[in-house]
Curated annotation (Swiss-Prot):
It is found in: Nucleus. This is Small ubiquitin-related modifier 2-A. The keyword Nucleus applies. There is a cross-link at residue 11 (Glycyl lysine isopeptide (Lys-Gly) (interchain with G-Cter in SUMO)). Ubiquitin-like protein that can be covalently attached to proteins as a monomer or as a lysine-linked polymer. Covalent attachment via an isopeptide bond to its substrates requires prior activation by the E1 complex sae1-sae2 and linkage to the E2 enzyme ube2i, and can be promoted by an E3 ligase such as pias1-4. This post-translational modification on lysine residues of proteins plays a crucial role in a number of cellular processes such as nuclear transport, DNA replication and repair, mitosis and signal transduction. Interacts with sae2 and ube2i. Covalently attached to a number of proteins, including top2. It comes from Xenopus laevis (African clawed frog).
């Protein structure tokens, strides 16, 4: 009886939401469902929390271009199942 609500990811034809993949350098992939008009900062922060990282430690790129926190999937013309790449910042040379 706990499963009364319909599953969300079933109707991907609804153009209001988009499924995005975030691929880390270690080969890990995390999937997110986000509204096309939602700033990507929400996805970026959620990814950092899930991975235990700070926003200062990593950079997000889509099609090789840096993503700004204010960008939305609609602005970047992202399509369903597109992939965002994550790169760790290279800082300093000491341990």
């Amino acid at each position: 009886m706990a499963d009364d609500k319909p599953k969300e990811g079933v109707k991907t034809e609804n153009n209001d939401h988009i499924n995005l993949k975030v691929a880390g350098q270690d080969g890990s992939v995390v999937q997110f469902k986000i509204k096309r008009q939602t700033p990507l900062s929400k996805l970026m922060k959620a990814y950092c929390e899930r991975q235990g990282l700070s926003m200062r430690q990593i950079r997000f790129r889509f099609d090789g271009q840096p993503i700004n926190e204010t960008d939305t999937p609609a602005q970047l013309e992202m399509e369903d199942e597109d992939t965002i790449d994550v790169f760790q910042q290279q800082t300093g040379g000491s341990f």
